[in-house]
């Protein structure tokens, strides 16, 4: 059960306190990264005031790991009292004092890389992906990540796309993997986290959105002009995985060469994509004879999803 003092601090952190009273918050320990600690009214998230996540929500578990890396004892105690999970704390504690505090608060001793990685990635959530990143990123307390140890998990999720993440630096591979998982499972907070943290990987985000059929993120990238890729190359990526109807259609509407797409699908032996591309070719050549389900020139991802959610490829087109 939370103490009265802990509950009071939590209640105050959920209020909007005028700047002239910030000294009181600092005195009460509601202070972190030179700003008042703000909590979401309806969830267990900290509202960050520092860049690059200004105004964004960060789960208490992730915020706790950040505080542990900073050796901020008061904030570590505070977040743990508020319900943050200290389980992984010892993996990030950089001093003996911080390690001892984490032990007292219930952190698990002796965790290895594989246990941490597998435990967090078992459930694909924004919180788990960001937490996994924060634990391993710039962490001298852990051994260097071994790609081979986690190879089975990575290959299962990325399939052929795994060849695009090869790098001489293991951490770069894992960052790309976490980013890809965020896009694949449409985890908006995690996508934004990696976009803000790794601005140089915007092309990777685009490639993941296309390959994993995330037309919503693809549309956002295209509308905001975050990064540019040749439209026919985008279509080739979309055709690499079968049933990628959403991103294939989006690339088609943007002007990708549908004949080239048909060739690519044949090369990959993706029959369902092939039938779909042939239907799109019919739509382009003669709207009247095309399948009634398909409509031309739609770029709204919600409308594309609604249009194609019941689409079933047929073998009516000759190969």
Swiss-Prot record:
Signal peptide: none annotated. GO terms for biological process: taxis. Keywords: Early protein. Belongs to the asfivirus MGF 360 family. Plays a role in virus cell tropism, and may be required for efficient virus replication in macrophages. It comes from the Viruses. The keyword Cell membrane does not apply. Induction: Expressed in the early phase of the viral replicative cycle. This is Protein MGF 360-8L.
